[in-house]
């Protein structure tokens, strides 16, 4: 960490390499300790009419799970939901599901909702969500297949990597890139300063 910033101990409760890079871009020192909570089980039990609440709930559960083992740290946790027509598009995990997701999203508008939470000593200090709205081009089968072979975005909600070649799939985007990537930086920066986790 540079001398410009003074900070308290921070943990990022996420295994996402993109969130790791975004946090690093802020010049912070932090540990990475992913949560062991069962996301799929929580999603299955949740009411589909309260999707933003689901994202916030997942972020809180992740942060609280890690906080019980690291009470001296401020825990930052996040969750990302890709939603179209009140349906959540989870990570496809394989090629066949990714093809299906891109077919369904082709030519349509969908939302990427980034949910954040900061916890210390098992107390929730801050929670936040931000939405980006994206519209894909009408994608041919050839385009879908070529894109998936090029990037294999099977660990990405929506079956695309916006930080890479995925940008070429879109005709309109409303919202910040870091929201699409799952970690809205300016709200997080302001929260860390307001909570006196980071000082300048």
Curated annotation (Swiss-Prot):
InterPro entries reported for this sequence: ITPase-like_fam, Maf-like
Similarity-based family: Belongs to the Maf family.
Gene Ontology BP annotations: nucleotide metabolic process
PANTHER family assigned: BIFUNCTIONAL DTTP/UTP PYROPHOSPHATASE/METHYLTRANSFERASE PROTEIN-RELATED (PTHR43213), BIFUNCTIONAL DTTP_UTP PYROPHOSPHATASE_METHYLTRANSFERASE PROTEIN-RELATED (PTHR43213:SF5)
Reactions catalysed, as given in the entry: a ribonucleoside 5'-triphosphate + H2O = a ribonucleoside 5'-phosphate + diphosphate + H(+); a 2'-deoxyribonucleoside 5'-triphosphate + H2O = a 2'-deoxyribonucleoside 5'-phosphate + diphosphate + H(+)
Domain of life: Bacteria
Single GO cellular component term: cytoplasm
Organism from which the protein derives: Legionella pneumophila (strain Lens)
Pfam families xrefs: Maf
Active site: 79
Hydrolase in keyword set: yes
Keywords on record: Cytoplasm, Hydrolase, Nucleotide metabolism
CDD domains to which the protein is assigned, alphabetical: Maf
EC number: 3.6.1.9
Name this polypeptide is given: Nucleoside triphosphate pyrophosphatase
Cofactors demanded by this protein: a divalent metal cation
Gene Ontology molecular function: any one: nucleoside triphosphate diphosphatase activity
Free-text function comment from the UniProt entry: Nucleoside triphosphate pyrophosphatase. May have a dual role in cell division arrest and in preventing the incorporation of modified nucleotides into cellular nucleic acids.
Subcellular localization(s) per the UniProt record: Cytoplasm
Primary site of residence: cytoplasm
């Amino acid at each position: 960490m540079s001398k410009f910033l003074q900070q308290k101990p921070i943990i990022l409760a996420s295994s996402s390499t993109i969130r790791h890079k975004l946090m690093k871009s802020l010049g912070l020192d932090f540990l990475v300790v992913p949560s062991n909570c069962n996301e799929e089980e929580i999603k299955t039990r949740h009411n589909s009419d309260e999707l933003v609440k689901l994202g916030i709930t997942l972020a809180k559960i992740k942060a609280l799970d890690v906080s019980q083992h690291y009470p001296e740290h401020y825990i930052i946790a996040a969750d990302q939901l890709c939603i179209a027509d009140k349906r959540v598009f989870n990570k496809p995990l394989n090629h066949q599901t990714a093809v299906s997701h891109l077919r369904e999203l082709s030519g349509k508008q969908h939302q990427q909702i980034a949910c954040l939470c900061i916890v210390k000593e098992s107390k929730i200090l801050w929670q936040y969500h931000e939405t980006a709205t994206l519209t894909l081009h009408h994608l041919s089968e050839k385009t879908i297949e070529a894109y998936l072979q090029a990037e294999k975005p099977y660990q990405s909600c929506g079956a695309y990597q916006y930080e890479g070649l995925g940008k070429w799939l879109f005709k309109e985007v409303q919202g910040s890139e870091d929201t699409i990537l799952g970690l809205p930086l300016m709200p997080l920066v302001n929260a860390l300063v307001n909570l006196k986790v980071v000082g300048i």
